[in-house]
């Protein structure tokens, strides 16, 4: 297996990340799960829209939020490993886990 293929497979171990989102993550410079630790999902989403030159479905932001949580947590909660838990107003927000920038924008 080539190193690029190994990295590709590693990114797809993240819940909710398939081939397309793994490619998006690589566009953002993420080549392994550890690269997601302490990243800003909202910033990643904005950067991806800029790179694509177009609007990107908001569900991608939810996957980025979930992926950053999953990568930076030693024992991720299975419910919080689901991308839809990271939707605006979702379970992660109810638990106070949303990024500060998002919480500030909604208050």
Residue ranges of model-derived segments:
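C-terminal extensions
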Residues: 1-15, 19-107
């Amino acid at each position: 297996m080539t190193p690029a293929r190994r990295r590709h497979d590693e990114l797809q171990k993240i819940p909710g990340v398939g081939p397309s989102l793994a490619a998006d993550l690589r566009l953002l410079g993420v080549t392994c799960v550890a690269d997601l630790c302490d990243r800003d999902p909202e910033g990643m989403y904005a950067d991806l829209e800029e790179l694509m030159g177009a609007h990107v479905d908001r569900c991608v932001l939810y996957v980025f939020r979930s992926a950053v949580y999953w990568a930076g947590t030693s024992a991720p909660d299975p419910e919080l490993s689901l991308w839809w838990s990271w939707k605006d107003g979702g379970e992660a927000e109810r638990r106070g886990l949303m990024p500060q920038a998002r919480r500030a924008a909604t208050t």
